[in-house]
Curated annotation (Swiss-Prot):
Family as reported in the entry's similarity comment: Belongs to the bacterial CoaD family.
GO cellular component: cytoplasm
Cofactor: Mg(2+)
SUPFAM superfamilies: Nucleotidylyl transferase
Name of this protein: Phosphopantetheine adenylyltransferase
Residues annotated to bind ATP: 14-15, 22, 93-95, 103, 128-134
Protein species of origin: Vibrio vulnificus (strain YJ016)
Amino acid sequence: MSKKALSRVVYPGTFDPITNGHLDLIERAAKMFDEVIIAVAASPSKNTMFTLEERVDFARQVTRHLDNVTAQGFSGLMVDFARAVDANVLIRGLRTTVDFEYEFGLTNMYRRLLPGLESVFLTPSEEHAFISSTIVREVAIHGGDVTQFVPTVVAEALHQKKKV
């Protein structure tokens, strides 16, 4: 599969924490597009387990092997971030029909706020379809083993958070 002319895409999310499901989508997007920017949302309305800086750092660490992937934190509207980095496409993951309904509404809002911004939806590989950051946090908080759901650096950080 060949790439089109220069394409810069944004994969936005809270990534609290980044999971193997996220990484699966990032690796696949990196093969399809020239540049992938992981946009880690500050999300002040959410009570995140990890700070914005930690979440950006995790994203950078787990994607070091991908030359065309970077990670940045942002606050405010995602469309403003996309405009600031001159991105023309958003990557969004869909696990369920509930995700689809939510993303469909967001996509229409994004189009109104930033005409020309397209959304590309990727479904996760079967082994990652059930993974969510929320579930991973819950399992970790209750002492469960999350090593099969998140990259090693994240599993270690979750283990440390549980000790605190």
